[in-house]
């Protein structure tokens, strides 16, 4: 996975933190925002009863139910839930760390800024497009990830309850990173 010119070493990691600390603060500050925005979102939901589920359902219909019924498999349930809980975060943030570690400031600037702007643009949708969990709204739909294990159920309830609508960061972040790498990779390294 590393470019041919790259060498992995402890000194490289130390140098990476020394040279790119501002990039890391920009991207990882999102975790601080998430706690603040989650608190604000819960206050808004409790006081305004915002529910835009009918709008999302008007666009999607029962498509997610058809996908669930067509692809339902116990093995996929476990793999995809665990990938979502850990793999998605690792894949997203390693794509940010990758150009930083290999000292490509041009790409590091663009990837960190694209991730930053995706989060900024998602805030109004996050706060004002609250939706119900799909399994609680669509008749016959199961909340597979919620019900896989008690630990994962607790994680979803506390950290990512799926109550915020479009545009999804789960699509927005990987797409923005891919688009950034595709558009700004001038030397063909990435």
Residue ranges of each PLM-predicted region?
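Hydrophobic cores of alpha-helical transmembrane segments in multi-pass inner/ER membrane proteins
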Residues: 1, 25-30, 91-95, 176-179
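Transmembrane alpha-helices
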Residues: 1-7
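Generic serine detector
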Residues: 9, 29, 64, 94-95, ...
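Short amphipathic alpha-helical segments, especially helix-boundary/capping motifs
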Residues: 10-13, 69-73, 85, 98-99, ...
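N-terminal transmembrane-helix/juxtamembrane module of multi-pass inner/ER membrane proteins
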Residues: 10-90
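Membrane-interface loops
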Residues: 39-54, 101-188
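Hydrophobic alpha-helical transmembrane segments
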Residues: 82-99, 170-176
């Amino acid at each position: 996975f590393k470019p041919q010119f790259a060498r992995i070493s402890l000194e490289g990691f130390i140098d990476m933190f020394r040279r790119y600390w501002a990039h890391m603060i920009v991207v990882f500050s999102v975790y601080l925002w998430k706690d603040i925005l989650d608190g604000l979102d819960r206050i808004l939901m409790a006081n305004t009863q915002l529910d835009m589920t009918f709008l999302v359902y008007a666009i999607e219909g029962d498509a997610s139910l058809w996908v669930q019924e067509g692809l339902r498999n116990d093995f996929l349930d476990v793999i995809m839930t665990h990938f979502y809980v850990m793999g998605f975060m690792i894949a997203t943030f390693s794509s940010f760390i990758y150009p930083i570690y290999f000292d490509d400031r041009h790409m590091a600037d663009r990837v960190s800024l694209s991730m930053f702007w995706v989060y900024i643009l998602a805030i109004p949708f996050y706060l004002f497009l609250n939706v119900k969990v799909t399994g609680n709204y669509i008749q016959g739909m199961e909340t597979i990830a919620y019900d896989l294990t008690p630990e994962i159920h607790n994680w979803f309830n506390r950290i990512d309850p799926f109550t915020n609508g479009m545009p999804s960061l789960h699509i927005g972040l990987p797409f923005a990173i891919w688009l950034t790498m595709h558009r700004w990779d001038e030397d063909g390294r990435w």
